[in-house]
A protein has these predicted regions:
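Hydrophobic alpha-helical transmembrane segments
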Residues: 5-10, 54-55, 86-91, 115, ...
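C-terminal ends of transmembrane helices
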Residues: 20-23, 43, 94-106, 133-140, ...
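Cytosolic, membrane-interface loops and tails of multi-pass inner-membrane proteins
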Residues: 21-53, 185-204
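Short, non-helical or kinked segments that cap or interrupt transmembrane helices
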Residues: 30-42, 102-115, 142-150
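Interfacial segments of multi-pass membrane proteins
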Residues: 46-50, 72-76, 92, 96, ...
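Multi-pass membrane catalytic core of lipid/isoprenoid biosynthesis enzymes
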Residues: 47-73, 89
Length: 204
Protein backbone atom coordinates (compact mmCIF):
# COMPACT_ATOMS: atom_id res chain seq x y z
CA UNK A 1 0.00 0.00 0.00
CA UNK A 2 2.79 2.44 0.94
CA UNK A 3 4.64 1.96 -2.34
CA UNK A 4 1.41 2.23 -4.32
CA UNK A 5 0.74 5.63 -2.77
CA UNK A 6 4.33 6.69 -3.48
CA UNK A 7 4.02 5.71 -7.13
CA UNK A 8 0.78 7.64 -7.58
CA UNK A 9 2.22 10.67 -5.78
CA UNK A 10 5.34 10.59 -7.96
CA UNK A 11 3.13 10.46 -11.06
CA UNK A 12 1.21 13.51 -9.85
CA UNK A 13 4.45 15.42 -9.25
CA UNK A 14 5.67 14.54 -12.74
CA UNK A 15 2.39 15.74 -14.17
CA UNK A 16 2.73 18.99 -12.24
CA UNK A 17 5.70 20.03 -14.37
CA UNK A 18 4.03 22.60 -16.65
CA UNK A 19 6.35 22.51 -19.64
CA UNK A 20 4.48 25.27 -21.48
CA UNK A 21 5.61 27.65 -18.75
CA UNK A 22 9.02 26.04 -18.22
CA UNK A 23 9.94 26.02 -21.92
CA UNK A 24 8.65 29.55 -22.44
CA UNK A 25 10.74 30.83 -19.54
CA UNK A 26 13.82 28.97 -20.76
CA UNK A 27 13.40 30.46 -24.25
CA UNK A 28 12.59 33.92 -22.87
CA UNK A 29 9.10 33.99 -24.32
CA UNK A 30 5.98 35.51 -22.81
CA UNK A 31 4.19 33.40 -20.23
CA UNK A 32 1.58 31.39 -22.21
CA UNK A 33 -0.95 32.17 -19.50
CA UNK A 34 -0.80 35.85 -20.55
CA UNK A 35 -1.92 35.57 -24.18
CA UNK A 36 -4.23 33.70 -26.53
CA UNK A 37 -6.52 31.36 -24.62
CA UNK A 38 -4.43 31.75 -21.47
CA UNK A 39 -3.98 27.98 -21.40
CA UNK A 40 -0.47 26.69 -20.56
CA UNK A 41 -0.37 24.14 -23.35
CA UNK A 42 1.35 23.48 -26.67
CA UNK A 43 -1.45 24.90 -28.83
CA UNK A 44 -1.33 28.22 -27.03
CA UNK A 45 2.48 28.31 -27.08
CA UNK A 46 2.20 27.91 -30.86
CA UNK A 47 0.29 31.20 -30.89
CA UNK A 48 3.48 32.90 -29.71
CA UNK A 49 4.85 32.21 -33.19
CA UNK A 50 7.66 30.01 -31.87
CA UNK A 51 7.11 26.56 -33.36
CA UNK A 52 10.15 25.05 -31.64
CA UNK A 53 8.80 26.02 -28.23
CA UNK A 54 5.39 24.59 -29.12
CA UNK A 55 6.88 21.29 -30.30
CA UNK A 56 9.06 20.99 -27.19
CA UNK A 57 6.05 21.69 -24.98
CA UNK A 58 3.97 19.10 -26.80
CA UNK A 59 6.64 16.41 -26.59
CA UNK A 60 7.59 17.04 -22.96
CA UNK A 61 3.96 17.16 -21.80
CA UNK A 62 3.35 13.84 -23.55
CA UNK A 63 6.58 12.28 -22.27
CA UNK A 64 5.73 12.99 -18.64
CA UNK A 65 2.52 10.99 -19.10
CA UNK A 66 4.44 8.12 -20.68
CA UNK A 67 7.13 8.14 -17.98
CA UNK A 68 4.60 8.16 -15.14
CA UNK A 69 2.87 5.04 -16.47
CA UNK A 70 6.10 3.23 -17.36
CA UNK A 71 7.57 3.82 -13.89
CA UNK A 72 4.36 2.51 -12.32
CA UNK A 73 4.38 -0.56 -14.57
CA UNK A 74 8.07 -1.23 -13.90
CA UNK A 75 7.49 -1.15 -10.14
CA UNK A 76 4.25 -3.12 -10.43
CA UNK A 77 6.14 -6.05 -11.92
CA UNK A 78 8.61 -6.02 -9.03
CA UNK A 79 6.40 -5.11 -6.09
CA UNK A 80 3.39 -7.17 -7.06
CA UNK A 81 0.62 -4.59 -7.29
CA UNK A 82 -1.93 -4.69 -10.10
CA UNK A 83 -3.09 -2.72 -13.10
CA UNK A 84 -5.25 -0.53 -10.88
CA UNK A 85 -2.21 1.28 -9.50
CA UNK A 86 -0.75 1.69 -12.98
CA UNK A 87 -4.04 3.19 -14.15
CA UNK A 88 -4.15 5.49 -11.11
CA UNK A 89 -0.61 6.64 -11.85
CA UNK A 90 -1.64 7.63 -15.36
CA UNK A 91 -4.67 9.48 -14.00
CA UNK A 92 -2.49 11.17 -11.36
CA UNK A 93 -0.07 12.46 -14.01
CA UNK A 94 -3.03 13.87 -15.94
CA UNK A 95 -4.43 15.50 -12.79
CA UNK A 96 -0.99 16.95 -12.08
CA UNK A 97 -1.05 18.68 -15.45
CA UNK A 98 -4.54 20.06 -14.81
CA UNK A 99 -3.83 21.09 -11.22
CA UNK A 100 -0.03 21.43 -10.83
CA UNK A 101 1.20 21.92 -7.29
CA UNK A 102 4.24 23.82 -8.60
CA UNK A 103 2.11 26.40 -10.44
CA UNK A 104 -0.61 27.24 -7.92
CA UNK A 105 -2.84 24.46 -9.27
CA UNK A 106 -3.40 26.45 -12.49
CA UNK A 107 -2.63 24.01 -15.28
CA UNK A 108 -3.50 23.19 -18.85
CA UNK A 109 -6.24 21.15 -20.44
CA UNK A 110 -4.23 17.94 -20.53
CA UNK A 111 -4.43 16.87 -24.17
CA UNK A 112 -0.73 16.08 -24.68
CA UNK A 113 -0.34 14.47 -21.26
CA UNK A 114 -3.45 12.37 -21.83
CA UNK A 115 -2.00 11.26 -25.16
CA UNK A 116 1.19 10.15 -23.43
CA UNK A 117 -0.76 8.24 -20.79
CA UNK A 118 -2.89 6.50 -23.43
CA UNK A 119 0.18 5.50 -25.44
CA UNK A 120 1.84 4.03 -22.36
CA UNK A 121 -1.29 2.17 -21.23
CA UNK A 122 -1.87 0.63 -24.67
CA UNK A 123 0.21 1.85 -27.58
CA UNK A 124 -2.21 0.54 -30.23
CA UNK A 125 -5.20 2.34 -28.75
CA UNK A 126 -3.02 5.38 -28.09
CA UNK A 127 -1.99 5.53 -31.74
CA UNK A 128 -5.62 5.15 -32.83
CA UNK A 129 -6.56 8.10 -30.62
CA UNK A 130 -3.69 10.17 -31.99
CA UNK A 131 -4.83 9.33 -35.50
CA UNK A 132 -8.36 10.46 -34.69
CA UNK A 133 -7.06 13.71 -33.20
CA UNK A 134 -4.85 14.38 -36.23
CA UNK A 135 -7.65 13.66 -38.70
CA UNK A 136 -10.10 16.04 -37.04
CA UNK A 137 -7.43 18.71 -36.52
CA UNK A 138 -6.34 18.61 -40.17
CA UNK A 139 -9.89 18.64 -41.52
CA UNK A 140 -11.23 21.40 -39.25
CA UNK A 141 -8.10 23.18 -37.92
CA UNK A 142 -9.77 23.18 -34.51
CA UNK A 143 -7.45 21.65 -31.90
CA UNK A 144 -10.22 21.78 -29.31
CA UNK A 145 -12.70 19.89 -31.49
CA UNK A 146 -10.07 17.24 -32.22
CA UNK A 147 -9.48 16.84 -28.47
CA UNK A 148 -13.20 16.54 -27.74
CA UNK A 149 -13.77 13.90 -30.41
CA UNK A 150 -10.78 11.91 -29.18
CA UNK A 151 -11.94 12.20 -25.56
CA UNK A 152 -15.25 10.61 -26.53
CA UNK A 153 -13.55 7.88 -28.55
CA UNK A 154 -10.82 6.85 -26.08
CA UNK A 155 -12.97 5.15 -23.39
CA UNK A 156 -14.84 3.20 -26.06
CA UNK A 157 -11.63 1.88 -27.60
CA UNK A 158 -10.12 1.00 -24.22
CA UNK A 159 -13.31 -0.79 -23.17
CA UNK A 160 -13.19 -2.79 -26.39
CA UNK A 161 -9.56 -3.79 -25.72
CA UNK A 162 -9.58 -4.12 -21.91
CA UNK A 163 -13.15 -4.94 -20.90
CA UNK A 164 -13.82 -4.02 -17.27
CA UNK A 165 -10.18 -3.30 -16.40
CA UNK A 166 -9.40 -0.40 -14.01
CA UNK A 167 -7.61 1.13 -16.98
CA UNK A 168 -10.98 1.81 -18.63
CA UNK A 169 -12.23 3.64 -15.56
CA UNK A 170 -9.12 5.83 -15.42
CA UNK A 171 -9.41 6.67 -19.11
CA UNK A 172 -13.11 7.50 -18.70
CA UNK A 173 -12.33 9.90 -15.85
CA UNK A 174 -9.57 11.55 -17.90
CA UNK A 175 -11.94 11.95 -20.84
CA UNK A 176 -14.66 13.49 -18.68
CA UNK A 177 -12.19 15.95 -17.14
CA UNK A 178 -10.72 16.81 -20.51
CA UNK A 179 -14.18 17.62 -21.86
CA UNK A 180 -14.92 19.69 -18.75
CA UNK A 181 -11.69 21.65 -19.19
CA UNK A 182 -12.77 22.43 -22.76
CA UNK A 183 -16.20 23.77 -21.78
CA UNK A 184 -15.30 27.33 -22.83
CA UNK A 185 -14.05 25.98 -26.15
CA UNK A 186 -17.35 24.16 -26.66
CA UNK A 187 -19.18 27.47 -26.24
CA UNK A 188 -16.84 29.17 -28.72
CA UNK A 189 -17.23 26.34 -31.22
CA UNK A 190 -21.01 26.66 -31.04
CA UNK A 191 -20.75 30.45 -31.43
CA UNK A 192 -18.24 30.25 -34.27
CA UNK A 193 -15.61 32.22 -32.35
CA UNK A 194 -13.10 29.45 -31.57
CA UNK A 195 -9.50 30.10 -32.67
CA UNK A 196 -8.06 27.80 -35.30
CA UNK A 197 -4.62 26.24 -35.35
CA UNK A 198 -2.05 28.76 -36.51
CA UNK A 199 -4.01 31.82 -35.43
CA UNK A 200 -2.00 34.66 -33.91
CA UNK A 201 -1.89 35.26 -30.19
CA UNK A 202 -3.82 37.96 -28.40
CA UNK A 203 -3.30 39.04 -24.82
CA UNK A 204 -5.47 37.00 -22.46
Amino acid sequence: MFWSVCVVLLAYLLGSLSFAVIVSRAMRLDDPRSYGSGNPGATNVLRSGNKVAAILTLLLDAVKGVVAVLIARFLAERLGYGDGVVALAGLAAFLGHLYPIFFRFQGGKGVATAAGVLLALNWMVGLACLGAWLLVAVLTRYSSLAALVTALLAPVLFHFMHGDSPVVGAVAVMSALLIWRHRSNITKLLNGTESKLGSKARKA
